[in-house]
Amino acid sequence: MLQPKRTKYRKVQKGRMKGNSQRGHELSNGMFGIKSVHEDGMFLTSRQIEAARIAATRYMKREGQLWIKIFPDKPITKKPLEVRMGKGKGAVEYWAAVVKPGRIMFEVGGVPLSVAKEALRLAAQKLPVKTKFVVARDFEA
């Protein structure tokens, strides 16, 4: 599972996810990718990212390369069940990545278009966000 090795602070505030992604909205490594087109931002947990990675790499059968372009660096806390409010913030439950609309989440290279499309479709099924398959501008079929 992905998570930071060390952080400056153990817990962070929830924050708001307004607007579209300011960075990471163009392909940088591979020829194909999946982009978030959800109406508003979402948290993707490290488990969801890992499930999508496994689904894509299994279909590609170790051919080509897969890049994960998001990293779960936000700790999400939760208080235990049946505990009254107050008494401080809960313990860190899991790590999540903030994904805004327009963000490229996974990139694939070194495989044909049909293989990349199916691998990323299988990966997208594991994610709770609406996605769109994108192709690099300099790609020639």
UniProtKB/Swiss-Prot annotation:
Protein name in the entry: Large ribosomal subunit protein uL16
Keywords recorded for this protein, A-Z: Ribonucleoprotein, Ribosomal protein, RNA-binding, rRNA-binding, tRNA-binding
Subunit structure: Part of the 50S ribosomal subunit.
Domain of life: Bacteria
Role description: Binds 23S rRNA and is also seen to make contacts with the A and possibly P site tRNAs.
GO cellular component: cytosolic large ribosomal subunit
A Pfam family it matches: Ribosomal_L16
PROSITE patterns (alphabetical): RIBOSOMAL_L16_1 (PS00586), RIBOSOMAL_L16_2 (PS00701)
Regions annotated as coiled coil: none
Record region (Disordered): 1-29
Record field: transmembrane: none
Sequence similarity: Belongs to the universal ribosomal protein uL16 family.
Keyword RNA-binding tagged: yes
Keyword Ribonucleoprotein: yes
UniProt-recorded Gene Ontology molecular function terms: rRNA binding; structural constituent of ribosome; tRNA binding
Any GO BP: translation
Ranges of Basic residues composition bias in the record: 1-17
